[in-house]
């Protein structure tokens, strides 16, 4: 399990004005919480956060968080959530969750389709229904990505949660029948089928109208 070093400062002010002041001074308001601790308002450097996300992404990160003035040198945490202003692309707030590496946690892991399926070779397309899945495991057992082999999938085939095996130490807490990905037919085929259905409906409606006219 890789731990990424990140520094933080205690945060005294609360409310929108205090948060705005932090953002205007190259810092992002954040909070650290955990099962056996009171939540701690903190802040992190905007530059440090940006660099971390650019290098490591924002999913499934475990961090060695050193808070200035804390009672311990550092805490093992995971990045739980980042809130962003999607218009200005600025960080608004960050949630960190303290963890115990010997205890199981729930975390989201990205899903990746691998291999060129029979269906894709025939013109179909892989459609990811769920780009991330929640898993329950110890931090050290967490896979960086859930890879699904699509080699033998034909058009119309799907992969469900019950078909994904991540080992005995990793649990997927989703419904076993949940569809994760599917191989869909080419768009042109779908449009042709829809067109044929519309044509059949038009013919049936015309025939019905003609029958009504004859009866009158």
Swiss-Prot record:
GO terms for biological process: translation. Residues 189-216 have a biased composition (Acidic residues). InterPro entries: Rbsml_bL25/Gln-tRNA_synth_N, Ribosomal_bL25/Gln-tRNA_synth, Ribosomal_bL25_b-dom, Ribosomal_bL25_C, Ribosomal_bL25_long, Ribosomal_L25_dom, Ribosomal_uL5_bac-type. Keywords: Ribonucleoprotein, Ribosomal protein, RNA-binding, rRNA-binding. One of its GO terms (molecular function) is structural constituent of ribosome. SUPFAM superfamilies: Ribosomal protein L25-like. One of its GO terms (cellular component) is cytosolic large ribosomal subunit. Residues 184-216 are annotated as: Disordered. Belongs to the bacterial ribosomal protein bL25 family. CTC subfamily. Part of the 50S ribosomal subunit; part of the 5S rRNA/L5/L18/L25 subcomplex. Contacts the 5S rRNA. Binds to the 5S rRNA independently of L5 and L18. This is one of the proteins that binds to the 5S RNA in the ribosome where it forms part of the central protuberance. NCBIfam families: bL25_bact_ctc (TIGR00731). PANTHER family: RIBOSOMAL PROTEIN L25/GLN-TRNA SYNTHETASE, ANTI-CODON-BINDING DOMAIN-CONTAINING PROTEIN, RIBOSOMAL PROTEIN L25_GLN-TRNA SYNTHETASE, ANTI-CODON-BINDING DOMAIN-CONTAINING PROTEIN. This is Large ribosomal subunit protein bL25. The gene is rplY.
